[in-house]
Amino acid sequence: MRINNIIGIGLTLLLFAACGQQQQAKSVVKDFVADCLQQDADYLDFTDVDSTLSGSDSVITALRQQGPKGIQYAERKGKALKYIRANYLVNDDTLSATFYLDAEMTGVVAYKQN
């Protein structure tokens, strides 16, 4: 019985950590869209936060060049990136984008319109 309690507590803590991570990513993306892209958006949905190691420096540079000029992106620290996809409305247009966040999820490293 004691093992079951420990496992239950561990799973509960893991769930709370994952929820906090999801909320942190959403907040960073919303701030980025409002401040850097200067779009007043209504958010429809977000995917779950996930990790990737496939974002090489050349891919990040290419993604940054596709977007508007003058955007301040977060610095990439390490190889791992987090990403989240968002569907949102701007002026009655439905947009979809993938946002790549630094590992600590403090800022957007790059994004791409889907």
Give residue ranges: language-model regions.
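Sec-dependent bacterial lipoprotein signal peptides
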Residues: M1-C19
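Cystatin/cathelin-like cysteine-protease inhibitor module
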Residues: C19-N114
